[in-house]
Amino acid sequence: MWFDVHTHQLSACPSEAIFNCEGSYIPMPGEAAFLSVGIHPWYLSKENYSHRLHEVEALIKHDKRVVAVGEAGLDKYAEAPFALQEEAFRAMCFLAEQYRLPLIIHSVKTYNELMALKKALHPSQSWIIHGFRGKKELAQSLVRQGFYLSFGEHYHPDALAVLPEDTFLLETDESCVPIKELYRRAASIRGRELMPFAVRMEQLVNSLFFNR
């Protein structure tokens, strides 16, 4: 009911969260029912790129818990050369298409680049920008271009308030705020009763991650 689409913490309800795998740590099945895996620009280098790409694809192929590719993305503040970031991001896009999985995106100061890549690549799988904190005008522009947005603990309330309900998701990311509280806050911002709002969100989660 209170599905968390992106978290770095093991959930008390493993069947209601997508745990983001980083590095070589893979939780046991009893700890996490669903996983995402990708190459994060923070942890990317010329030396580890080929190895990480192999690791990511191997996990997608062999662990049925993987329901999304990511985090993957572009970050103007990351140490990795931007050209390498883009190469890795394109590789993650390819894996998302090949294995028919949604793509969870990390973006810092790179929305223009993301929009250009989406137009160039014409992906058939969903692109979900996680931890979105932009203003409502940017949110509306991204949604018009087919992106989904995922909101965590911190965001502009007016951005969440104006979006169609089938275009955004909720996540804890690294926050200690319970996911149910984030649902409560979002429902309040949108003037919705909590339970009907949660049911509508569950329908979107199912359509994006579990309709295969």
Regions found by a protein language model. Name each.
Residues 1-212:
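Mid-domain alpha/beta scaffold segments of enzyme catalytic cores
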